[in-house]
Design a protein with these regions (language model features):
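Positively charged n-region of N-terminal signal peptides that target proteins for export
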Residues: 1-5
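Extracytoplasmic entry segments of secretory-pathway proteins
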Residues: 6-9, 101
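Bacterial N-terminal signal peptides
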Residues: 8-19
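Extracytoplasmic metal-acquisition and chelation regions
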Residues: 24-320
């Protein structure tokens, strides 16, 4: 008798739970910045699971190749959130394999820069998405769009808005919660942007030398100048002639600080620093981070750390 009562109660419970289980949504993000934004937009929503496609230590997706495991994750996705602007070079393959999978492009409406950060990017190609699987997969070409849009907090706000709209379109049953999360997050990002502008407006020196093309959007937004970029793509080896030219450029600029990134080695920076005396600092492009127990303020925390690093690096010590 007890067994029958237990089974009856269990059946009733499953009947009530089954709609919730059936409506569980899987949101897949392409890499870490989009993952951080998605976590904030879906916090507190029990019916949504966030899966990040690239491992949290991957960094930028310059040469990222989809694995069999990635394709299995995408096969279970209800929506795929991407950075866009050319970051996901594999996108055509995803769309061909999963033609019904909604893809939300966070870069929509953002004015893009070229890879060198000097000009606005003009898309003269007749396509809507990344040209995927090219032979020179992920490598730098002058005039290509710079995809590191999230390092301008105003751009981050636009990205969050685009992602929120896409999530609501894909899962309208969560609209109220997503809208509340959007409002809360945009308020925090707006405060971050104002703080960055106010703080960095005061630094007397504006030139920085970076080791990757991650920071042109940051520099444009906050009044800095990327005077030189050492490696257009992380891991590119410099020839002796290229190294000598960089040393000459940096000396001509009165040895501005060199900014490395924690995701990549600083061997070239150390060499240039020895030759010029230029100091070395670290800026984080927020492309890696913890996989579990991720603080919702992780993006803001790293951006404020970058702000403090720049404040120290670009403000002469008293007496200088």
């Amino acid at each position: 008798m007890k067994t029958k009562k237990f089974l009856a109660a269990l059946s009733t419970l499953l009947i009530f739970l089954s709609p919730a289980l059936a409506s569980a949504e899987t949101v897949v993000t392409s890499f870490y910045p989009i993952y951080l934004f998605a976590l904030n937009l879906t916090q507190g929503i029990d019916g949504i699971t966030i899966r990040n496609l690239a491992a949290p230590n991957t960094g930028c997706l310059h040469d990222y190749q989809l694995s069999t495991g990635d394709m299995k994750v995408l096969n279970k996705a209800d929506v795929f959130l991407i950075n866009g602007a050319g970051m996901e070079s594999y996108l055509t393959r995803v769309m061909d394999t999963f033609p019904k999978l909604p893809v939300v492009d966070a870069s929509t409406g953002i004015t893009l820069l070229t890879e060198d950060g000097m000009d606005e990017y003009v898309d003269d190609h007749d396509h809507d998405h990344e040209d995927e699987d090219a032979d020179d997969h992920g490598h730098h070409h002058a005039g290509e769009a710079n995809a590191h849009i999230w390092l301008d907090a105003q751009n981050a706000i636009q990205m969050v808005d685009n992602l929120a709209d896409g999530l609501i379109s894909a899962m309208p049953q969560y609209e109220a919660q997503i809208e509340q999360n959007r409002a809360d997050y945009v308020a925090r990002l707006t405060a971050l942007d104002a703080e960055l502008k106010e703080t960095l407006a005061a630094v007397p020196n504006k030139n920085i030398v970076t080791f990757h093309e991650a920071f042109p959007y940051f520099a444009r937004a906050y009044g800095l100048t990327v005077a030189a970029v050492v490696n257009h793509e992380p891991g590119d080896a410099l020839s002796p002639a290229q190294l000598a030219e960089l040393v000459r450029t940096i000396r001509a600029l009165n040895n501005p600080p060199l900014f490395t990134e924690p995701q990549y080695d600083d061997m070239a920076a150390q060499t240039i620093s020895r030759e010029t005396g230029a100091p070395i600092y670290t800026l984080d492009p927020v492309v890696t981070g913890p996989e579990t127990d991720v603080p919702l303020t992780y993006y803001e925390d790293r951006m404020r750390e970058n702000m403090q690093t720049l404040l120290v690096a670009l403000t002469p010590a008293k007496g200088e």
